[in-house]
Every structure is written in C-alpha cells, then in structure tokens.
C-alpha cells in the first residue's frame, strides 16, 4: 500500500527526522474512504505522523487492509512532489554531485532547525481536517459509535466515487474456490483482529457517510513490479521517500514566491531510502529521530530542498484551503536536573573558529568535533577531490551498467529475478518407505558382514597359535631377531618413561626451590613494606618536632596559623568559639617563649629557608635521612643530669621536663605504623612559593603509602604529605632521634622537692600548641586508649576546645587518635596549658609509660584512679622491641603480649589506665573508679545507666561528634541495646537529630528491641517493620515523612526483601545488632547493606572475631567503605599480608608459643582496633558480677553406641574415605560419628521388630497328599447311603424351632397359590414350545423365548417343593420347653437368672460380688493380665505362618468351633437403651499385638545414650539444688529426642528454635524467667545467640560441641549477663574417646585466637576445668585415641578442619601443590559442609532453626589462615632420597674429586638440578593456587575431588 502524506509529513522526513520536540500539531489530510475497523490504526497514524515511527507490523497490516478495500490508482512514495519540484531537485542534485560540493557546503547542527507549525492544507481536497480530529470552522464533526471523530485518510480523487449497483464478480480462477468480498482483516471496536472471510463487515463499523463500493475494489489497476515489491515490505507512515517519482501527476501552476521563513525552515524529502522513517507504536511518546545521513546534514542541500518544497507548497494552496487552522502548542516541562537559563550570560557560547565559512572549513578538519570542528580521530581521512572523482566514476559506471545490456540490467542481474517459491514437501509414498527399509537392511547386512570378518580373523589367529602350540617348530633367525627387537623396545620405553619421570621430579624440585625463594622474598617484601611505613611515619613525626624546635614563629603567624587550623578542622567539643579562644590563649603562651625558641635554632643544620631541600626529604630513604641529619643533637637524654646540662642547649629546666613528658608520650613501637599514620590534618596558609614546592612533590606522593592506606585515600594522603612539607619552612628534621625514656626523664624532674614545677608542659622547647599538633600527627594511640580523669581537667575542658591539630580529616572513618575523643582521654590536645603538677595529679599515670617500680604505679594510680584497671599489665623487654624493628634504636612503650598471657593494655578497650599486676594468677574485677564523663545523660532516657554504660554513651557520642563509625563490642549481657538507645536519645536532645534511624536486628529480638525502646525512651516513635507484603505496604504509608516515626526496627530478612525501599531513604544512623551477620563480604546481605545511604553507622556484636581475621576485615571495611573510589579501609589481601603470621601460629601451637615478631604484629592489630572499637568484659565493668564456672562432663558410650561407633569406623569404605582427600566425604563421616555420639537413634533408629511371615507353612506342602488320601480312601458314594435329613425322617432335628413359630408358618402357607402359578406357567410353556430352527434370526428368537418360559416353570416347581419341605418342619418338644428344662451349668457357681420376672429382684439381691471377684470373666482376666503382657510379652516369634497351619493342628471341627466362639465373643452388645450395639473389646488383642510387633521400650531412649544417662543424673542434682538449666544443641533432631527424654521423666520444659514464631519467643522467654516450676529450656545454639535474656537459669548445658566457640559463648551469655544473681555453671557433655574431644580441641584453638586478637585474657572469672580437658587432649594438644580407627578419624578431622598436623608454618598443606592432603575447606565453611552432610530432613529443620543469623552461611565461607609450609631441611631430605640414606653417608666420607679444569665434580643429581634450574630461568613460576578462588570456582562441584593427580 502506498499513501500520500502532507508536505508537513514530507518535511519531517526530509529533515532527517529532526522536529521540534515541543510541537506535535502538524496536520494531515487523509482520504475519506476508510477501511472498516481501521480507526484505531488510523488514529495512531495521524497522531504519530511527525513525531515517531510507526510499528512495522501495524503499518504492514494497515497497508494490507487498505489495499484490499481501496483499489485506487497506485501512487508512488514520491507522488507528493510535482514535476517542477522534480526538475528543481534534479538540478540541485546535479550541482550536488560535484566533487567539492560536500566540502564547500557548510554543516549545521540538526537540533537547531525548526519547522513551521502552521498546517499545510491538502493539495487535492478542498476540505482538510486537523490532527486533533476537529473539523474546520462552520463544519460539524462527525463522530463514530465511540464518540470519537472518524479516522482520516488522504483523498486520492477529486470527487467521491458513485455507489454503483452491484456487478457480478469476475470468474474465479480454477485453482480458487472463492474470493474475499471485503477486507481480509477486521479490527473490532475492542481492538481484536478478526478474519474478513468468515466474519461479515458490520454496518456500524463503517463511517456514516463514506461507503466502500464494490467498483472501487474491482477497478484497482495492477501494480507494477516495484510497487508490488514495496507492498510486501512494511510501508512507513510517511512514505514520501522513493527512488523513482512517477510522472502521472499533472504539474501544478507556478507557485508564488514563498516567505523567507518558510523557505528557511521547511525541507524537501531527499530521494533516499535510508532517510525514510518508521512510526513509533505509541503516538503519545515521540521517538528520538534517527541520526541523519552524512549527506543530509549539509546546509546547502537542506536549503535547496526547502526552497523547492516551499515553492511546491505555495503552488498547491487553494482558496478554500488557505484558511489557517488552530495552532496547538505543547509545553514540555524541562527535566529537573537541568538548570534553566535565565540570562544570556549563563549560556556557554562557543567561540567562533573563523569569521567566514571558508576559513572555518579550512581549519575544521584539524579541530576535534568536541571543540566545534569536524575532525574525528576514528573516522576516515578527509574527503578529497580525488576521492570524490573516484566515487563519481563508480556512480557513472553503475548508471551505465543499469542500462539494457549491462551487468546490472534487469534481464541480466540476479537481483531482479523473482524469489523462488518454496516447494511443499512431498508426501512419502510406498516407494519411499521401501527405499528406506532397503537402506536400513543394507546397513544391517554390512554390519553383520564386518562382524563375521572380524570373527573369522580372530578365529584364524587363534587357530594359527594353537597349531603352533601343538606342532612346535624351531624359531627362525628372523623370529628371534624380531623378539629381541620387541624386548629392546620394551626396555627402551621403560627407560624413557623412568628418565622422563626423573626429569619431571627434578623439575618439581627446582620449582619447589624457586617457590621457597619466592616465598622468602615475598615475606621480606611484606616486612620491608611494613617497616618502611613505620619508619616513614616516625620520620615525619621527628621532622615536625625538629621543625617546630628550630622555627621562629611570630605572634602574628602563630595566631593566623592557629585560627586557620581551628577554623579548618571541626572542634572536638562542637564549640567553635571555645576553639578560637583556646587557640588565642595557646598562641599567647607560645609568643612568651619565643626567646627560648630562638635559642633552639641551632638544631637546624642550615639557616636558609630552602623549601626544595625540605620537600626533598619526602623522597629520601631512612639511611639517606640519617646521613643528612646525622649532626643534629637529640631532643632528650636518659638521665637527669643530661636533661639539665647545657650541651643540649635547652631553655630551662621546665622546658627540659616538658620535653621528657612529650617524648614519653610520643615514644611508641617503631614497628607500628597503624597509628603513626593517624596524623592531624593541619592546614597552614603559607605563601605561594611553598605551594609550588608542594606541586613538585605530587609525583612522588603517588606511590603506595603502606599502612596509611588503611585509613586514608589517595587524596587525603597527598594532602597530608603536602601539609607535612609546608610545616617545615626552615628546619631540616632529624632522621632517627633518640627518644627520652619516660621512666628516667620524667619522674626525677617531677618529684623535685616533693612536687612538680609550676611550669607549663613543653616538649623540649615545644609550646603547648606545638605539642598538641605533634601528638596529633604522631602515631601513638595513648590518647584514644588511656583516660586521665580529674575534676580540674573537666573544669578546664569546659573552657578549652580542641587544638588546631586535633581535627578530623573530613569524614574518614579511621581518623587520627586525637580526633576520636573518648571519655576523658583528650589530655594532650585539650589540656596543654595545664601545669605539670596538675597534669600528674589529675592523671596519675601518663599514658603507656614504662613503670620504674610497682610503688610508683600504685602511688600514681591511687592519686587518680582510672575508669578501668586491667587485671594484668606487663611490658615487654628491649629484646622484643629489637625483634620488632631492628633499625629502631629507641625504646618503645607499645604494649606486647607476655610469655604467659597478653596484657589487657593491648585489648581494644577505649578507656583503660595502667594498673599493677597482682601476684595471684586468677584476676579479680577491678576496683570501682569515679571518672568524669562529659556527655550528660539525655533527659529523654527513662531509668539510670550504669557507670560503664554512661562511659559507653560518652564514647559513642564522641564517635558521632567526630563523624566516625565504630563497633560497640561489649561482652554479651552488658547492655549494648541500652547504650544504643541512649545514643539516639543523646542525638535528639543535644544535636536535635530525631532521625530517621534504621535499626537492623535478628528476627527473634525485633519485639525485644521495641519493648526496650518503649521502656527506656518512650519519646521516640517506633516503627517495627515486619509482616507479609500487604502489612509492610500498609506500614510504608507516609514512609518519607519524618514526623510519622523516628526509628525503624526491622530484620535482616526484611531488608533483603525490600532493599529497594530502604535504599531510597536517607538514614541518619544505621545500627546493626548481632553484626557478625555481615561477617562475609561476599554475601548478599553485606553487599546490600553496604550500599545504604547513611550518615553514620554503628555495629553491635559480642563476638567481633569468630573465626579469622577476614571476618574482622569485613566489619572494618563495612564501616569505612571508599567514597568515589578513594579512601576507605585497606583491601583484604593487604590486610592478610600484615596479620597472617600470628593467626597461623595461634592455630598451630597456641598463644604461649608466639614469637616476638608475631607479638609485635598483634600489638599493631590492637592499635588498628583501638580508635573505633570499644570492648568491655563483665569482669572489668561489673563489680558484683557472679562467677562463671565451666565443667566438662565426659560420658561413656553405651554398649549400642560403642558398637555402632566402632562398627562404622571399621568399615572398609569408611577407612578409604578417611584416607582420601575428598573433604566432603570426610565431613560426612565425621557427621555420622557425631550423630552416634549424640544419640544412636540419629545414626540408625531402633527398628520395630516383627516376625518373618512365611507365605506357606511347611505342612502346607502335604496338603495335596492329604486331600488325595481323603478323596480316595475316605470317599463315600452318595447312592450307597440314605440322607435321612433330606427325607425329613429325623424327628428331633428341628428342636431349635418353636411350635408357635411352625404353627404360624402352616397358617400362612401359600402352597396352593404356588401350585396354581406352576400350572399356569406350564400351560404357557407348552403353548409356546418351539423346536430349535437356526436357519433365521427370527426362529432363534422364538426358540429363546420358549426356553425362557420353560425355565420359569422349573423355577416355580422348585419353589413349590422348597415351600412344602419347610412347611413340614415341626419340632417334637419345641424350643421353649427345652430352654425351660435346660440347666445353665456353664454359669456355675453363679446362680442362673430366673425366667420368671417376679424372681429377678430376689436374684439380684442374692447375687454375691465376692463370687464375681473370685471368678473373673474373660474380659476381667484380660484387663488384669494387661500389665504382665505389656512388660513380658516382648519377644516376637522369629517366623510365623499362614492360617493353613491351624487346620492341621486343630482339624476342621476345631477351626469351626473357634470361629463360632469368636463370632459370639465379637457379637455387638447393646450396653445402653439409646446407644447402638458395640462389639466388646477383644481380650486377646494386646497379647496378639505384643507377640506380633515389638516396639522399642521408651526407657531405651536413655539407656542407649551415655549423654542422656549423664544428663539424667545432672538434672536430678540441679532439681534438688533448686537450679534451672538451659540445654543447647546444634541439631533439631536432638531437640526432639530431648523432648521425649524430658517427657519420660516428667520434667517441665520449654522449647525454642528457629521455627518458633517471633511473637511466641518473647512470651516463652518471659514465662521461663517468671515460672520457677519450669526446670529446663531446650534451645538450638543458633537461636541461643539471638539476644534472648534468660537470666532465670543459672546453668548452661551444652549437649554437643559447636566447632565455632563464638556460638557457645553467645549461648553462655544468655544467662550470664546483667541481672544474674547466682553463679553460672556451664557443663559440656563430651563423649570420651570419640571425635567430640577433637572438636573441643579445635574450639579451644579458635578461642585462643579470639583471646589474643580481641579479648586479651577474656576469661578472667571462668574457672575452666583444665585438668579434665588435659586428660583427654594430652600434653601436646592431641586427642588420646583408643584404637587405630580413632587415630584415622582424628587425622582426617585435622586435615579437613585444619590443624597442626596438616599445616606447616605457612598454612599450606605440606606439598607445594596441595595434592598431598585433603583439599582443606575453609574453617568458617565447615558448618555449612556439616549441614550438607546431614540427612535431608535434618538439614531442613536446622535451616528453619537458624534462619535468623545463618541465612547466607553458604556465602560466609572464607579461607582460614593458611600460609606456605616452611621448607626446613626439605632440600637435604630430597637429596638423601635421591642418593639413598646409606650412600649419602659414603659420599660424605669420600674425597672430593676435581676435573681437568680444577672444578669440583658434582653428582648427576646436582647436574640435573643445575641444568633444570638453568633451563627454567625466566619461565613463569606456578604459584600456589588461591584456596578462596579455587573454592569459588569449585563451589558447584558438590563433594567432588578436584585435587591435582
């Protein structure tokens, strides 16, 4: 179908699809004849004419329907163009084909063109309708049935065709039976598409005034070839683009000159097929116009086309169509992201590149497109004249070949050939089937032939061999030679194979040595990087100190610097005014000491202000800096005389004393750069020359910054380095300056005359501000670690604010220590103006100093007690410091872990002070202290906070004030929830921040958090977000309104389900309870929460370290994610490189055997954690906390358990599995062993025993013989005996009948009636008798009817006989007489019931109940024997047979008697008048069932398990002592067994697991705490760690061991927490000599790791029964096994779970490629593997119980701390293996031989090793595969062994 579009539509297409997006009012004129049902499609066409592309399918369908109903003369796509326009366009195209036309015509931006919005009237029709379906003025628009304007079509005729009368159809072709009279497709009103062949066209679907005539359909001319080919394609809506323009249209009159505006803004359609556009399927959304072609962008082309089109438009206007149509203006709202231009100056006008177009195009090809030119690097070179000529030649040649006779002529070119019609597939005929069968049969015959030939060959060879065997012949020379050749070849292959194997071994050995060298080099690199970072931070600190000492600071400079620093960094107290006042006060004091500072200028080695020299220090190494500043004097000495001497050139004694104090504070472990990099971000406003020097140093600052990357991004690091350079204007600082020992320098100076000098504290000649700055820049974490409380300090703090150097670096998480203002620990940064005496008296101890004596420490501690005194404090020796950093020469005061136990100073406590270690090994709780806390308790908080909770609030408030995230890691039970609520209340009261806050908690404690909020802070509006989808949707009403609620409490599952909702909201504080849920950074939970929009984050967890350091890193990175790709925490690889060594040593050999380097690294880790982690233990903060005792109860296996355990281990497949390397199979075996230990029913249930039922008994085989004998020998002939009963000749046969009954039968006799019926039937049968005539069907039917009548007669005759026989049955005496005369002797000794009713009452009175009790009935006897039968009828017969055995034992009569008796006993009895009769109970049912089915005894549940036996004794003891217990287990099935156990013993209990509803958990918890009658509460270990308070119990019983000790620790804290008044006893049930002892050992090793890294001596009040554990574990930590099978199981467990037996010093298993041992799974993934090894139903139950905190445990798998094995003497061992043990000794004794060149002669092995090493030089070394990546790739390989073979 081809259509005619208006010039507007043509213009839209000719303009390369570029239209104004704000205008959509272009009008079109359409034909008045429309296809019925095309209204919807036409609306789409009209609405989307100029703005979009129409859908291909819609266009195609519309075109088809239009073609089928409108037979109008075919008009080509360019029919809208008149002849004049064609001539103009042709002339223009000729001009455009010149070579330089494409270059000379300027380009223009397509977006700048606009089209005239005035509609262009139709060319041919006097009427036209607008695009909005409104008629013109004076016309009434016609509406269709829907009330919409009719569809619009272009008219193709001047007049409407007449409605001719119907003409006969043309004759149909012979291959067609009928032809469609109307449209083949009808679109109904509801938009459905129907076929027009079977559905008539309704009149209502046609327009009212436009009728489709049949003549219009029939008079359609045949389209030409091109139009036909075009009609098959989807016709575009604006089909004005065509290659050929027909000349059928008469040329219009010459048009007048068009207006300039119209000629400038309208365009003519280019005759290019690529420029045509398709309409969008949606008319409302204008589609983006397609990118115009390169030629179409030339402005000259568009102008020419616009001019020609405008001429054509003006010429086509008629008077009737010249009226203007209403203009529609669509206002499009600009996007919100675009700032509107309100002034011309806001527009970014691009400067002109040339005054004229010629100059522009001369330069445009060199200027990039982005800058306004035409140069595109990726495009082809400039279009030159030669290229244009070449293209023109190609075009001319194509035109020439198109002519007749050319290659492209229609008669020669294959492109013009019609497409071949697809032939229909030919149906299979008989010949086809026959051919297929023949082919198949041929294949089978050929295959059979081949098999026969092969068999014949084999038989021939076998015959030949057999013939030679039977007829041996002497071998010929050729045969002998052939055999020798084969033997030689075999030997050669063997030698080559052995030789290749030897070289392969050599290659493996060389690679092993290379790997060892690489590992050593890698360790050196890591250590060097660590030391370099430490040295760099220390050098920066020393440079700043030396620079401050030698710099002359004027009052103005000092004031300006202080003001800039104070204004540039946030104040600690949040008061900018106080900060400014304190800065001014400090600057005045500094100006008073300028004379002293001038005396220190000789500290500098040069007096000039060479900034380049100072800046160049950043790029120098440590050795170069030492050489450069070797002549600098030290800042302090180690004794009192050196401090006061004049050689140091100090100003005065107070200054020297202050220097010692500052040195004491600044000295630190030089190997620790974690906090050295926490320097302040001081800003100085130096001159521009210093800024230029900073820019020169930027290149050197881009290198890696070591541990600085832990805390700062690249931009912050660069800024810090620039500031460090600008702070050194004239002084060249010293490289390594000897730091003064505090114990030698501070104390004597402080104790002069019993009091300290009343002088300000200075650092050498440092002033107070300089001291604060240097301390902030330094790396020491004493500021964040120690608290020196005093009322004077508190008073002073109210007047002073942070020093300029104590600011925070923007919003970085891990900022400097002084910026993390913990309670009362802002000593150096806020109290620098305090005199020395006040400082000492206030603080007692200066932070982290080497105490000279215990008395001094006690005296200082007594002067001002600290917040928390750690129970054990010990400092390392000088050797430890030397081992940490060999280059450091100064003694450090960084805390170390001692040989026996680490000090609590190393723990990440934020508020600690040094105390004295008590001689007792058992440490008690510290003495109460009264420190000063600055953060007030918010008035919104109801209740009273404990002292340590108030300090926690102060710490949290300090974190928020410094824009820092943190971890509140208090031990379970210390009230982390209350402290969090207090923090939110503090934000509301003091910062006026009410929210919104997001609190994410486990599902089980959601309601608990809501109750705590309502109890402690009822002023908050709480939204508990949970429920189904509809409930959550209802709760989200008013979600973005801050006044609806303040705190949203939800669970981890809800966050994952509705993460999009939570992401869109900006949260002020996001708090995660039980934060170990996000310990896996690969889990969906971690990644989802990481992307939330939050201002601050807080993590609450009682176990910050559960398994390894990867989990700790996940928490740290979650708190400090990088912003815009910069900053954030260090990556995981670097973090593991720092701290992998101590972790592996702890897991291998325990905490006591750590080397000095590992201890130093542990100290560094503590310093990393201190700034943002608060960890308090119950023993440290609670003065009246009850003690906690831990016991291990070893349970002997029961007999059944031992049999199952040993039997499983002794299996061949079990041994093979334990020795294999497939860890899934090993874990499966270990899980089965654990099930046996927990209860044997978990491993295999006690069966319900039944007897074996034989299908046939043994005597049944003789049944046929017995029947044969009876039939043969005992057979009776019927004719020889007379049946008297049949003859009715036995008088007493009917005595069971009553005479009355027989008389009544005789009275009601119907004998006569039956006789009459018989006779009548006989007559009918005789009359209808017919002989059999099978000749016809009719005769057969007549015979069948006759036979039926005779059959009826015989039936009636039999009835007459039976009736007469029964009528004659009469008794002699009758039933009543016999019953009356019968004595009930079977009822004796009971008196029979009288038959006279009058005597029944006397019979009841005479009945004796004693007689009834003496002689019980059968039912009473069965009830009395029920207990005996139940207890002792427990042995079922081995075999039972069928019922045929009874017939041989009892006979037929016996069986009949038993059956009759059974029927009588089971007859229903009516017990009550209105109750239906019921059968009596079977007395033999219980005995029959007991002897048929043997159910296991309930008592065996306890006696089959050693743990339950021990638990029974333990519960009895607890119940007698008034204790209550919590019983924890891992497996859900064990909970079921415990329920049965408690039910058997009658104990009251409650059960809680993951399947318990959220609403019920709090109810169960409250019920247990308030009901002392409940003895036990059985829980799952997973549900035990969900923040549930069960202080009503004082005993915790672990039924089985969890491989993760953190889970057990959480379970203990359910009852050992605040509110517990009694001592807590913990019992662990461990099966002795089993795998559980090894699990206990592994848990102890992980606990050691937690003690060293996090706790540092956590169990101070836990009196663990270590002797019992040592009895099992042995002296070396190995489990004492009872037999070889136990040893194999323990070794397999070590291989799988990781242990000393399988990991070397490095952690990789002993081989280089890991093939020698099991593919070790991650330690944290073992729990998941154990779940996979369990039964399916157990796994489902465990998932339901652990869904709150273990939902994504499969993702939580992380690799344990593993490192490559230490080579040791592996090389020598391998040499010994190659040479042999004895031969090696002989080689050592031999004399060394030399060759002719005087070189030592080596062995072949050495030669091979050297040769291979030389050959492998430069080749890539295969490094050990990363276990984590390997697990990720092989995660889908469930249980497959993926090791290298």
UniProtKB/Swiss-Prot annotation:
- From the UniProt record, which GO molecular function terms apply? ATP binding; ATP hydrolysis activity; DNA binding; helicase activity; histone binding
- Which residues bind ATP per the record? 970-977
Q: Which InterPro entries match?
A: DNA/RNA_helicase_DEAH_CS, Helicase_ATP-bd, Helicase_C-like, HSA_dom, INO80/SWR1_helicase, P-loop_NTPase, SNF2-like_sf, SNF2/RAD54-like_C
Q: Name one GO cellular component term.
A: Swr1 complex
Residue numbers spanned by region Disordered: 1-329, 539-713, 749-935, 1702-1724, 1751-1783, 1816-1845
> Acidic residues bias located where?
549-565, 586-608, 663-704
Q: What is this protein called?
A: Helicase swr-1
Native species: Neurospora crassa (strain ATCC 24698 / 74-OR23-1A / CBS 708.71 / DSM 1257 / FGSC 987)
Q: What is the name of the gene encoding this protein? A: crf1-1
